[in-house]
UniProtKB/Swiss-Prot annotation:
pH dependence: Optimum pH is 4.8.
Role, per record: Probably involved in hypersensitive reaction upon Xanthomonas campestris infection.
E.C. number(s) listed in UniProt: 3.2.1.14
Gene field: EP3
Tissue-specific expression: Expressed in cells surrounding embryos, stems, seedlings, pollen, roots, shoots, inflorescence, flowers, siliques and leaves. Present in seedpods and seed embryos, but not in roots, inflorescence stems, leaves and flowers.
Reaction(s) catalysed (UniProt annotation): Random endo-hydrolysis of N-acetyl-beta-D-glucosaminide (1->4)-beta-linkages in chitin and chitodextrins
Gene3D superfamilies, per database record: 1.10.530.10, Endochitinase, domain 2, Endochitinase-like
Disulfide-linked positions: 31-39, 33-45, 38-52, 56-61
Glycosylation site residues: 24, 47, 157, 270
Signal peptide: 1-28
Sorted UniProt keywords: Carbohydrate metabolism, Chitin degradation, Chitin-binding, Disulfide bond, Glycoprotein, Glycosidase, Hydrolase, Plant defense, Polysaccharide degradation, Signal
Name of the protein this chain belongs to: Endochitinase EP3
Chitin-binding type-1 domain boundaries: 29-63
Source species of the chain: Arabidopsis thaliana (Mouse-ear cress)
Coiled-coil portions: none
Length: 273
């Protein structure tokens, strides 16, 4: 028979072991996942790359591929940047807002942008990013979506990111960030109130570029190996892909192939969607 002292010691050890096991089990359950599933960047459970890849919060997350030694700043030269923005009219608000310096400052927070895979992969990713930015902003002319304030970009089903009825979640910035379910997590990741101050994306050029890079690294970069067409689908597939708007798709492709030419890299396959 155990003495009371020994019994209490064993009980304490048992409790500690149970608590430790419970803690390990619940690490992947903060968003309702079982321990063998990943909690995605959006708070959903699963075990594929959509859940365990980029942005995975908890669980058996996949290790990201190692970054290469490419210098994005050496590829995105002032000449390259000017070649885009110089095509915007002098009256464009974006001329006084967007700059290579703001892009590079924002880039400091996204160390994997343009640095995954081979040197050619990096150049293709950079070309793809600026192709979409060129299309979305009209060569850095527009900061905000034309007539965006008149449009409703509040998805009430995205209850995790409740809309402020006095705010609009229309397109802003280089990638034209839209919808409350993008402004909310982007603000959390970057450090601004995306739901209550979405206009920050149109007033702070560094934050503006950060939202574009946030969207890119979380929503677009995971599919970039599938070709430029996959990046179109990730950005605006519902409105453009599968024959919905072939003219717009071709416009994006033209920008992409032109930038690939400027950066000295083959554009690859699967250019359309």
């Amino acid at each position: 028979m155990l003495t009371p002292t020994i019994s209490k010691s064993i009980s304490l050890v048992t409790i500690l072991l149970v608590l430790q096991a419970f803690s390990n089990t619940t690490k992947a359950q903060n968003c309702g996942c079982s321990s063998e599933l990943c909690c995605s960047q959006f708070g959903f459970c699963g075990n594929t790359s959509d859940y365990c890849g980029v942005g995975c919060q908890q669980g058996p997350c996949f290790a990201p591929p190692p970054a290469n030694g490419v210098s994005v700043a050496e590829i995105v030269t002032q000449e390259f940047f000017n070649g885009i923005i110089s095509q915007a009219a002098s009256s464009c608000a974006g001329n006084r807002f967007y700059s290579r310096g703001a892009f590079l400052e924002a880039l400091d927070s996204y160390s994997r942008f343009g640095r995954v895979g081979s040197t050619d992969d990096s150049r293709r990713e950079i070309a793809a990013f600026f192709a979409h930015v060129t299309h979305e902003t009209g060569h850095f002319c527009y900061i905000e979506e034309i007539d965006g304030a008149s449009k409703d970009y509040c998805d009430e089903n995205a209850t995790q990111y409740p809309c402020n009825p006095n705010k609009g979640y229309y397109g802003r910035g280089p990638i034209q960030l839209s919808w409350n379910f993008n402004y909310g997590p982007a603000g959390t990741a970057i450090g601004f109130d995306g739901l209550n101050a979405p206009e920050t994306v149109a007033t702070d050029p560094v934050i503006s570029f950060k939202t574009a890079l946030w969207y890119w690294t979380n929503r677009v970069q995971p599919v970039i190996s599938q070709g430029f067409g996959a990046t179109i689908r990730a950005i605006n597939g519902a409105l453009e892909c599968d024959g919905a708007n072939t003219a717009t798709v071709q416009a994006r492709v033209r920008y992409y192939t032109d930038y690939c030419r400027q950066l000295g890299v083959d554009p690859g396959n699967n250019l359309t969607c």
